[in-house]
């Protein structure tokens, strides 16, 4: 049983919090024992909601807290037991060169956000979780209640194009038609809420950090089709807005999508990461007391990073003002934000989607250089894949892991334990513990009233044993990533049979990597074209041609077997017309 203990002063503050209903954190004497409680999906004030449309069940609260919510206890979250104890995020950045941090991470005693928009009363009846489902009656109660969500800033489909959300059945046919308004619905259930960083100073984790007026609009949705790998996933969109209470510009900002995983028994958890899948994940070191011989694995996955403009990289700054000016500057890249089929895709010429900065973790108490972030500098360092002292972890000497069948000096430590536990190659976590994990992205800026949008997912998978669960998890992550890239269009039914058409020419990192002797290479093409996929050694000599033919639009997967080759680094290149992409892969016998 895992219990959080508090000092008396903090306990008094906690009681006051409960009394004034400023937050509802269930942090005192919280047991991680598997007691399964009956719980309605929405509480009486609708300040919390249980997404349970698929195999992965996630309780949410209107201040950004996930899982660790009073009243839900340890309700089974994935099959017969729990997989996560707490979920949320950290934000860290600079205000005029002064570092700041805040977040929602209750297992680490961080609860800096309260329900509602900046300046609102947290107890206002508007500040609830709004829920709409694919099965809701068109123009019925949920569609009408969604008017209040739109008042808070929720997106909607404006069928008649008048800029006003007015869900009316214009032709009285009892069905929704394309010229009529409807809520923003993705998957089979979509939730929406707003919260902001207005927690009082005495209750903030990092005291001295003022409320900046950061407003977060959170959308979460899930798919209820049991034949789809998405049946193991819940998607999250975070829209961050700086309302300028302190400064119109917050710089060098990082966002950490965070969780405290507990796969059944919380003491036997290990961590891994996969940079090709933008994911950090948790798995068991063997059989589990709660799940038995085949415990699941679970990930924090980034689907789309924030939009950033970088002079010289994403645009040519012709007037040298550091700002992208349409019609003056030359775009070198285009960022996107997918919103689903009805709302389409937002495009930002001259920008890119920021990538993952780190896939990282820390432990509850030990070692001292990698436990709960108790200072702002801790969060700042963790966000960039560094330890509390601001140093890179050395995989060659790190006591909690080991590098197997791979040169340890070639491991990138900002992607924690990025080896492959299934094949036992690379940097692996060797000591199970009570851990927290996150995927971070940045840096980016929070400018006055300019939204910054990001997509993430929590993905689970369960196989025949603890290692096979990792393989299943990665298949489910790949399906979730493709679902996002299709703008939440085509619903995959089997990972191996997906035919999701993407709007770009893309070559993916091979998997597994390193490999022995076989690996898989995936790529997508946007239309019918002649394609070559070739493998070269480091001297540029062609080793093998894998594809040399005309292909139709879509996604492809090719197996490459290097059994007769020597160990080493190889280059694989995808080419079609003027398009070409290449990546490295490592063959280790």
Model regions and ranges:
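Extracellular Ig-like/FN3 beta-sandwich strand-entry sites
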Residues: 451, 528, 553-555, 565-569
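Bacterial Sec-dependent N-terminal signal peptides
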Residues: 1-29, 493-495, 523-524, 560, ...
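Solvent-exposed serine/threonine-rich low-complexity stretches and specific carbohydrate-binding patches
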Residues: 543-551
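A long-range scaffold signal marking pre-active-site subdomains of enzyme folds
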Residues: 25-491
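Short, acidic/polar linear motifs in exposed loop/turn regions
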Residues: 243-246, 462, 511, 515, ...
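Glycine-centered coil/turn sites that cap beta-strands in beta-rich domains
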Residues: 492-511, 515-535, 545, 557-562, ...
